[in-house]
Curated annotation (Swiss-Prot):
GO terms for biological process: potassium ion transmembrane transport. Belongs to the two pore domain potassium channel (TC 1.A.1.8) family. This is TWiK family of potassium channels protein 9. Its main location: membrane. The chain crosses the membrane at residues 16-36, 191-211, 317-337, 370-390. Keywords: Ion channel, Ion transport, Membrane, Potassium, Potassium channel, Potassium transport, Transmembrane, Transmembrane helix, Transport. Residues 1-15, 212-316, 391-568 are cytoplasmic. The gene is twk-9. Residues 163-183, 343-363 dip into the membrane without crossing it. Pfam families: Ion_trans_2. GO terms for molecular function: outward rectifier potassium channel activity; potassium ion leak channel activity. Expressed in ray A-type neurons and cell bodies. Also seen in head, pharyngeal and phasmid neurons, and in coelomocytes. It is found in: Membrane.
Length: 568
């Protein structure tokens, strides 16, 4: 037993809105999930533990070779990352030294060019690295108590996998931007990133495409409103110009009373002339249209721009203007709260990000406004999707120029969330209008689509066939004038004196014309039947005369009985 959940029609809009909101909320939750996961997988403690396992202990190093001519002192080169693991005080020294240099030089480019980095080298040279006594080194200085150890750890610089950097990393992964400012270093982090991207990239791109469709519809509505407003302004201008021309052509000013009388008289004469020239009811309608007072005409003129969809050129121009304004406005906003970006750098960052180039030379640093930055990037990616869609349509046109349409019947048409092939759609449409199956089987769909495109371009007026004369079903009585011979000059009635059995031996079908004599003739015929018992009785009940679907002028039963009697 199948259970189906039916949403009431009045709540359909709510379900559609819920789908859009759910997609956006899903991307947000997925981004936070990825950020927290990467922050845990790439935590400094786990990375240090892994690096310590990979590095060989100093005590396990072999003793120096006792070869003549070699120095007694052996030097081993450590990387900065290895020194930071062996002695966390290196970062403390570097941070303090760099801040001092910034303060002394005041960020002057010339001073930076001639900067002496001896102080920085001293931090590495004075690193407290445990070296065996056999190599001439000194043992590592131990921390006296836990409080001093806590102070050293708290004074270390901010970790690269902070919550802000983790969110930016997760968002740039699923949007395929990929700044590259941070990257996973552990096996677990890299493995998680693969599965995270496999699921998140399609889901996020689907959400961005859905948002792009919403923005496309919104942009089309704006274009339609702009076109309607322009049409309205043109009509106002034409109306004002027409009134100005009329005022210039009028005679000298007359009193208001005389002017109204002349106007009313002219209007009445026009109405009378129009009514005499046309059938009743037709003149009024035409006159109203001529006077420009047809309200339906106004509504059609106003609704006409709504029915015409914006052309691709208009969409392209509008999208280009919108995208440019969006870049400039975003650059102005980002330059306010991003410390490393001025207006041009913010504009450069927006372009590189929204086009998914993602060089990573500039990364958002203001984590307090990170939500605004991510929303801006998401809407910008939707605008980029719109541009890609328009460009794809243009490329399709260029690709199929000069090619003949093939396999039109298998083209898929989408109706909301359901799809149907063109062939099935035409078949169901033919069944709806009772078109014979032979015609549907012989229907050339490619030619039909080709002609329909020509109609849209204006090359063909219409695909409608010329109308055939309609079959008229007569609702009035069937008259003898429709069946009599051309040589017969007049109709013959039962009560007519010209009708004689001697001169007209043949039995004629007594058909009575639609005249005022019909009822009298029937009554006379009934009286004749009563006088002559040999003639069967003609039923003149009101039920027979009123309940027939179409009025008739003779009794078929009587005619059949009367004819058989004459033949005998």
């Amino acid at each position: 037993m199948k259970c189906s959940f039916h949403i009431p029609e009045k709540y359909q809009w709510a379900s559609t809105l819920f789908v859009h909101v759910a997609l956006i909320a899903g991307v947000a939750v997925y981004t936070v999930f990825g950020a927290l996961s990467m922050q845990w997988l790439e935590s400094p403690d786990r990375v240090r533990a892994l690096l310590k396992r990979e590095l060989k202990p100093v005590e396990s190093l072999p003793p120096p070779p006792s070869i003549s001519g070699l120095p007694d002192r052996i030097t081993r080169v450590y990387l900065g990352e290895e020194l930071a693991i062996l002695d966390p005080g290196v970062h403390e020294c570097l941070e303090r030294t760099i801040l001092t240099l910034f303060h002394d030089t005041k960020c002057d480019p010339y001073s930076f060019e001639h900067l002496n980095i001896e102080l920085i080298d001293r931090c590495y040279a004075e690193a407290n690295v445990p070296i065996p006594e056999g190599y001439g080194g000194q043992p590592r200085k131990k921390i006296k108590n836990k409080e001093e150890e806590k102070d050293v750890i708290d004074e270390t610089p901010a970790e690269k996998w902070s919550i802000g950097n983790s969110v930016i990393f997760a968002f740039t992964v699923i949007t395929t931007i990929g700044y590259g400012h941070v990257a996973p270093e552990t096996f677990e982090g890299r493995l998680f990133l693969i599965f995270y991207g496999v699921i998140g990239v399609p889901f996020t791109l689907l959400t961005i495409a859905d948002l792009g469709m919403f923005l496309t519809r919104f942009l089309k509505n704006l274009l339609t409103m702009a076109r309607r407003f322009a049409h309205y302004l043109v009509k106002l201008y034409q109306k004002a110009k027409k009134q100005r021309n009329k005022s210039q052509k009028t005679s000298p000013v007359m009193p208001d009373s005389e002017r109204s009388e002349v106007w009313n008289t002219g209007k009445e004469m026009k109405e009378m002339s129009m009514r005499t020239a046309r059938e009743p009811g037709e003149g009024d309608e035409i006159e109203v249209i001529e006077n420009g007072n047809d309200e339906n005409g106004k509504e059609e003129d106003e609704e006409e721009p709504e029915n015409n969809e914006p052309r691709k050129t208009e969409e392209s121009i509008a999208l280009g203007i919108t995208f440019t304004c969006y870049l400039v406005a975003g650059a102005k906003i980002l330059s306010v709260y991003e410390p490393e970006m001025d207006f041009f750098k913010a504009l450069y960052f927006n372009f590189v990000t929204l086009t998914t180039i993602g060089l990573g030379d500039f990364v958002p640093k203001s984590f307090d406004y990170l939500l605004i930055t991510l929303i801006y990037i998401g809407i910008g990616l939707a605008l980029t999707t719109m541009a890609i869609e328009i460009a794809a349509d243009l490329l399709k046109k260029l690709h199929y120029i000069g090619r003949k349409m093939e396999n039109v019947g298998q083209a898929v048409v989408w109706f909301g969330g359901k799809k149907m092939t063109m062939k099935s759609l035409v078949k169901h449409l033919g069944d709806q209008f009772n078109i014979p199956e032979e015609e549907l089987a012989n229907f050339d769909m490619s030619a039909f689509v080709d002609n329909a495109i020509k109609v849209e371009k204006g090359e063909i007026a219409t695909l409608r066939k010329p109308p055939t004369p309609p079959v008229v079903f007569r609702e009035r009585a069937f008259s003898f004038s429709n069946v009599r011979n051309s040589s017969e000059s007049a109709l013959k009635y039962v009560d007519d004196n010209r009708f004689s059995k001697t001169t007209q031996p043949t039995i004629y079908t007594v058909i009575i014309h639609e005249t005022t004599r019909t009822i009298d003739t029937l009554h006379n015929l009934a009286d004749a039947i009563r006088r002559d018992p040999s003639i069967p009785r003609l039923d003149l009940d009101v039920h027979y005369l009123t309940d027939m679907s179409a009025p008739t002028s003779f009794d078929e039963n009587y005619l059949r009985t009367y004819t058989n009697a004459r033949r005998k």
